[in-house]
Amino acid sequence: MTASGKHRPMGARELVLLALLGALLLVTKLALAWLPNIEPVSLLVLVYTAVLGWKALAPVYVYVMMEILIWGLGFWNLCYTYVWLVLVVLAMLFRKMESPLGWAVLSGAFGLSFGALCALVYWVTGGWAFALSWWVSGIPFDLLHCAGNFAMALVLLLPPLCRYKLKRGQGRMCLALYFAYLAAALLLPRAGA
């Protein structure tokens, strides 16, 4: 907000950053696509929300639109329009939480509930029986999603230096440090392979 109380318009630099963060969601998901329901999207959405606040919705919906452009429109896209919003809202509610374990539990719980949240679309389109059968058949994948989200958040989410920077209001620096940390964590183990 400006001194007059109005929101300032988004500049080109900020617009490009938000678009690139959305693209990063897709690229990191595709990089780990060979693992069933193990993806860093939830982790990055939590980081984006911690650093950017409500502006994290912009990269989230850039990601959703790119998913639709690549994979086509389907019922699963409909759930993406609200499921990621749920995660951003939860992250905003717990934004001041400092416990890495708390963030890991939030991320894991989101992964576990992902199928149930997505089943709402199938309830509207096919009724309770269809939604319930769809959700139950996906529980093994929700368990993998839960475990992956929990582990990634516990290990990678907001390392100590990043949390220190956030407290000092240096969000952009925190985001840059986080991505350097994430890239090192994901790429270094492969260097010896």
Question: Across the structure, where does each feature detected by a protein language model lie?
Answer:
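Glycosyltransferase-associated regions of secretory-pathway enzymes
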Residues: 5, 10-13, 93, 171, ...
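Hydrophobic transmembrane alpha-helices
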Residues: 1-51, 55-59, 87-95, 157, 161
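Residue-level signature of the transmembrane alpha-helical core
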Residues: 19, 23, 47, 61-65, ...
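Membrane-embedded alpha-helical hairpins and interfacial helices in multi-pass inner-membrane proteins
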Residues: 75-81, 97-193
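Short hydrophobic alpha-helical segments that form membrane-spanning helices or hydrophobic packing faces
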Residues: 59-62, 155-157
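Interfacial aromatic-anchored transmembrane helix boundaries in multi-pass membrane proteins
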Residues: 26-39, 62-97, 126
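Hydrophobic side chains within alpha-helical segments
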Residues: 32, 42-45, 70, 122, ...
